[in-house]
Amino acid sequence: MIIRQMTKEDATEVAQIEKECFSQPWSTQGFTDALDHSAFFLVAEEAKQILGYVGMYVTVPEGEITNVAVKPEYRDRKIGSALVEQMQKWSLEHGVNRIVLEVRSGNMPAICLYEHKGFVKLGVRKNFYQFPKEDADIMEWNG
């Protein structure tokens, strides 16, 4: 498996993973628009197939992780962990020393991953998510 920077050519495949993983997924156009602006994405790839991705909007010295997803059949292979770790490394190399994110309060696998990578809970956004309605934990990492 390799982790590399996402390109616009990856947007359709990434959007398909997004659709499999989220109730309100970004579209292919949403990903290409993000890449045109201040977003940076990494993809995990094996045998020319994208297995997962992580995205972040960057305003140095801060970043906000927008999405982390791994194809359901490839979970439990530490792909999400590797993606977040590479994003943290990239961040430090590019002057980003603080990353924030929101995660569904009931998404314990993701919360555990973030905590393992050094993120701490800052607070809660009530009813942040829709379909289904759920609170979001706000988490932060300081590099």
Which residues fall in each region the model found?
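Short, P/G- and charge-enriched loop/turn segments at secondary-structure junctions
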Residues: 30, 125-126
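Acetyl-CoA-dependent GNAT
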Residues: 2-73, 84-86, 90, 94, ...
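C-terminal "cap" of GNAT-fold acetyltransferases
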Residues: 41, 97, 104-108, 127-143
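Short, conserved structural micro-motifs that define repeat-unit consensus positions
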Residues: 6, 124-125
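Non-catalytic, surface-exposed connector residues within folded enzymatic/regulatory domains
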Residues: 25, 77-78, 132-133
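Glycine-centered loop/turn positions within well-structured domains
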Residues: 63, 77, 137
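Short beta-strand "wing" residues that participate in macromolecule-binding interfaces
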Residues: 56, 121-122
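Conserved glycine-rich acetyl-CoA-binding loop
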Residues: 49, 67, 71-85, 89-94, ...
